[in-house]
């Protein structure tokens, strides 16, 4: 996956507008009765209508750059999720994301903190991310993969694999 960099010293107007838009939408979503027509409309708008049929996102949630998130069909995202999406986040069909999960597609350069390094995060079909797991930039969660609760995922997770720990390691193949 190709890394790209964002220079924070010269913020793009579009990125600044998107940042404000996401903060405001998350505030509205987190203060709206869940699973109502209004709530579902706000979630759809946060993700620029890139959310598939039958998908549910539970509050509270924090999303940075919602225009860089794509959510497939029948996805469940539980409470208190954090999506740092400058590098892009793709969640394919039938994925489950438990509570307190962090999907992070960007980080600060270790030598120059005013530069964001960005790599996309992808969760393939039927992947399951356990509570409190952190998925770092550039990671792909494999098809039918399981990430154990509390895992820190620093490397791609192969299809049909269970990983756990910090850093996450293969526990078994399924």
Question: Where are the regions that the model predicts?
Answer:
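Left-handed beta-helix
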Residues: 53, 58-59, 64-65, 72-73, ...
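Conserved short-loop catalytic and cofactor-binding motifs
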Residues: 10, 27, 31, 59, ...
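Short linear capping/connector segments at secondary-structure termini
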Residues: 40, 59-60, 109
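Conserved catalytic-core motifs of eukaryotic protein kinase domains, centered on the activation segment
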Residues: 107-109, 113-115, 139, 173-174
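Short, T/G/N/S-enriched strand-turn elements that build extracellular solenoid repeat scaffolds
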Residues: 45, 69-71
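Terminal amphipathic alpha-helical/low-complexity segments used for targeting or macromolecular assembly
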Residues: 1-54, 167-172
């Amino acid at each position: 996956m190709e890394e790209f960099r964002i220079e924070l010293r010269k913020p793009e107007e579009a990125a600044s507008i998107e940042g404000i838009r996401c903060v405001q939408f998350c505030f509205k979503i987190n203060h709206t009765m869940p699973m109502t027509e209004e709530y579902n409309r706000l979630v759809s708008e946060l993700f620029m209508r890139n959310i598939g049929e039958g998908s549910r996102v539970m509050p509270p949630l924090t999303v940075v750059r919602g225009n860089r998130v794509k959510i497939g069909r029948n996805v469940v995202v539980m409470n208190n999720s954090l999506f740092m999406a400058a590098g892009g986040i793709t969640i394919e069909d039938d994925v489950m994301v438990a509570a307190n999960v962090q999907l992070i597609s960007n980080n600060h350069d270790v030598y120059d903190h005013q530069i964001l390094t960005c790599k996309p995060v992808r969760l393939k079909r039927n992947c399951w991310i356990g509570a409190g797991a952190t998925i770092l930039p550039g990671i792909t969660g494999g098809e039918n993969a399981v990430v154990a609760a509390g895992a820190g995922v620093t490397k791609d997770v192969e299809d049909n694999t269970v990983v756990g720990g910090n850093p996450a390691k293969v526990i078994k193949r399924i």
